[in-house]
């Protein structure tokens, strides 16, 4: 019977230790991300034009009449700066303006990070997988800045990358693939 309070105390201390370790890991992750953002801003290695290329509404999650009304050609442009860290991973800060699904102007600005792989013998071919965090502003939201945290992927050769993201959603809302070309100058 005296063992029960001791076990409860050990479990409580263990939980507090896990929360403390989790908080320390989260704090380290935020600190590392801020350092990468700061380094990209202050020490850019390339200046990059962006060309929005495609908006695709997932056909499994939309009614056909909705898809027929949507724009899937995102005319627009953007720019950014890039920095590759010691491990060869891509960091970027960007701003893009393009025609959204309703053919209205949308702005998006943020920071992106991709783990970069060079799986072939040719070191110029590369793949990337990571995330982007930023804000977007759209006509149907009265251009109020809305925070975004989205997956990011790319395939590239030398200084040109085809980057993409997927905006999750519900039926007839969200579930959009968005892609653009990025040149490193």
From Swiss-Prot:
Covalently attached lipid (S-diacylglycerol cysteine), positions: 15
Pfam families per the UniProt record, alphabetical: PagP
Positions of the record's site feature: Role in the phospholipid gating: 171
Keywords associated with the record: Acyltransferase, Cell outer membrane, Lipoprotein, Membrane, Palmitate, Signal, Transferase
Subcellular location: Cell outer membrane
Active-site residues, record numbering mapped to chain: 57, 100-101
Cited PROSITE patterns: PROKAR_LIPOPROTEIN (PS51257)
Residues anchoring lipid (N-palmitoyl cysteine): 15
Record-linked SUPFAM superfamilies: OMPA-like
GO cellular component: cell outer membrane
Disulfide bridges in this chain: none
UniProt GO molecular function: acyltransferase activity
First and last residue of the signal peptide: 1-14
Site (Role in lipopolysaccharide recognition): 66
Topological category with respect to the lipid bilayer: Lipid-anchor
Catalysis performed (reactions): a lipid A + a 1,2-diacyl-sn-glycero-3-phosphocholine = a hepta-acyl lipid A + a 2-acyl-sn-glycero-3-phosphocholine; a lipid IVA + a 1,2-diacyl-sn-glycero-3-phosphocholine = a lipid IVB + a 2-acyl-sn-glycero-3-phosphocholine; a lipid IIA + a 1,2-diacyl-sn-glycero-3-phosphocholine = a lipid IIB + a 2-acyl-sn-glycero-3-phosphocholine
UniProt record, GO biological process: lipid A biosynthetic process
Catalytic activity, EC: 2.3.1.251
Family of the protein in this entry: Belongs to the lipid A palmitoyltransferase family.
Functional description taken from the UniProt entry: Transfers a fatty acid residue from the sn-1 position of a phospholipid to the N-linked hydroxyfatty acid chain on the proximal unit of lipid A or its precursors.
Assembly and oligomerization: Homodimer.
Name under which the protein is recorded: Lipid A acyltransferase PagP
Organism: Erwinia pyrifoliae (strain DSM 12162 / Ep1/96)
Upper classification of the organism: Bacteria, Pseudomonadati, Pseudomonadota, Gammaproteobacteria, Enterobacterales
